[in-house]
Amino acid sequence: HIPAVAVGTDYTCIPFWEETNLDYYVIPHEDLIPEYVKRGVSEEKLLPYGIPVRQDFCRNLSKEAARKKLHLPMDVPMFLVMSGSMGFGKLAVFAAELALRCRNGEHIVIICGNNAKIERILRKEFHFNKRVHIIGYTNHVSLFMDACDVIYTKPGGLTSTESLVKNIPIVHTAPIPGCETANLQFFAARHLSVSSKHLAKQVQLGKALIENDSLREQMSEAQRRERKPEAAMQIVSLLERLVSHE
């Protein structure tokens, strides 16, 4: 018998998992157990360890230290916009709207990922705006999260979990229907993020978070209650135990 473990990376029962017969299923949260059981996965096999993230997301650098490393200005509010590896829809329009509404000295960091086309468009659009920082592909996402005050991201399971573990206030943009919809609903129901499908409202929600310390702290407190930074280590320990028993 070769041990087999599945790791869920969305906050819902992964489609077709009930048709598998593995040793264990690592799921993002204990509140999802009833959904998995209803779909036919045995409760004894469900381990709510959380979604694993790289260890650098489990360590927090001070805002000042992170900004110094990234050569970002110190004493200004700062938004982080994650495009996703392929870019979330209408990013150029969103960035223009956010920049237009940032009238109190806020800075915006936009990480374009692998989307070279959107990176070119944004660099051209904001060439003369020194408060908008366009970043292409980077291995320093954790550092940028440390440096910024609020993050905009689509509700993918991994980036949402990285943001949750990092304890940075989240504004979720419109989901791709399916698992991302479930992720958004899970986060919103527990006050781990705010969201809107409307671009102008997304901007407004981020502005409210960055301007209101109390709102930001309420979300941060909810995130501290729900995050599971030890997920990766627990999964590794589980795999080591399973292999050693073979």
Predicted regions, residues:
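Acidic donor-binding loop of glycosyltransferase active sites
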Residues: D146-G156
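A short, well-ordered alpha-helix in the C-terminal region of glycosyltransferases
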Residues: L215-P229
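A short alpha->beta transition loop at the rim of the catalytic pocket in nucleotide-sugar-dependent
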Residues: C148-D149, N167-P169
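Donor-nucleotide binding loops and adjacent catalytic segments primarily
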Residues: K63-A65, L72-C148, T181
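A nucleotide-sugar donor-handling region in carbohydrate enzymes
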Residues: D23-S85, N114-K117
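C-terminal alpha-helical cap of glycosyltransferases
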Residues: K228-E246
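C-terminal "capping" alpha-helix adjacent to the active site of nucleotide-linked donor transferases
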Residues: A188-S214
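Short alpha-helical segment that forms part of, or immediately flanks, the ligand-binding pocket
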Residues: S142, S160-K166, Q185
